[in-house]
A protein has these predicted regions:
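Transmembrane beta-barrel domains of Gram-negative outer membranes and organellar outer membranes
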Residues: 14-244
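Cleavable N-terminal export/targeting peptides
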Residues: 1-20
Length: 247
């Protein structure tokens, strides 16, 4: 299996794409079942100098993040991420690890609304984060009706390290429509909003919209998206691909 997300044709100032570009829905492994997703991206044209001492500039760095998860109960799933990167002219490096616990409330999986929560804790290298210990609390909301699927994640990101700064707010949205059996087309929007207590103007911070294809192929779940940055702080063009399976 392989996953690849390429930031392509980018021009101007860019930031490193996240290790996981995904809107959480009600996907959940059955109790005792494992799953594996692979996420990857590369900024083709971006910053070439660090924004803080020790940061690895993102240009031409390939990021690959395997995500292994396991169903604990019908409503709980435990996941583990390993963050890796391949800088130009260097060997693969480990950027840290994260663990998550996802809860999805019982619901009709075929139609109607659903909700859940996701808590993530991690330690990352100085190359990708100025503070090593970080946490994210994610709300999961969604709805299925006819051929349509809607999803929304409101995220609170906080540093657990000393002097980590204010809690940051972001919003991820998804709307997809089934166009054939096992095939959906849609849009995903990823918006960083700034500090929770005083969000920034909408014209600030990275915001990117993706045209996406969701496809089941031979037991694999594929999410392919082409993204367009909407602000000067976002990558201009991003191509993302996530490949997942259960076993």
């Amino acid at each position: 299996m392989a996953g690849l997300a390429l930031a392509c044709l980018a021009q101007g100032d860019c930031r490193a794409a996240a290790e996981e570009i995904q809107v959480y829905l009600d996907d959940l492994s059955a109790p005792g079942q494992f799953g594996l997703d692979l996420h990857s991206n590369v900024v083709r044209s971006g910053a070439t100098s660090p924004s803080y001492a020790g940061e690895r500039p993102p240009q031409h760095v390939v990021r690959l993040t395997p995500e292994l998860y396991f169903g604990l109960t019908p409503a709980l799933e435990l996941g583990l991420y390993l963050l890796t990167a391949h800088p130009p002219g260097a060997a693969w490096q480990v950027d840290g690890a994260k663990v998550r616990l996802k809860y999805i409330a019982p619901h009709d999986g075929a139609t109607g609304g659903f909700w859940g929560l996701n808590l993530e804790l991690g330690r990352t290298a100085l190359t990708v984060s100025e503070k090593p210990w970080n946490a994210q609390f994610k709300t999961i909301l969604g709805y299925r009706g006819g051929p349509w699927k809607l999803g929304a994640n409101l995220n609170l990101d906080a540093s657990l390290s000393s002097g980590g700064g204010p809690v940051a707010l972001s919003l991820d949205l998804k709307a997809a429509r089934a166009v054939a059996e096992h095939t959906e087309l849609g849009l995903e929007l990823y918006s960083e909003l700034g500090p929770l207590r005083r969000p920034d103007a909408l014209s600030r911070n990275p915001k990117t919209i993706y045209a996406v294809l969701d496809q089941e192929i031979g037991g694999l779940d594929v999410n392919l998206g082409l993204g367009r940055g909407l602000t000067t702080e976002a990558d201009r063009w991003v191509l993302k691909l996530i490949v997942g399976t259960h076993f």
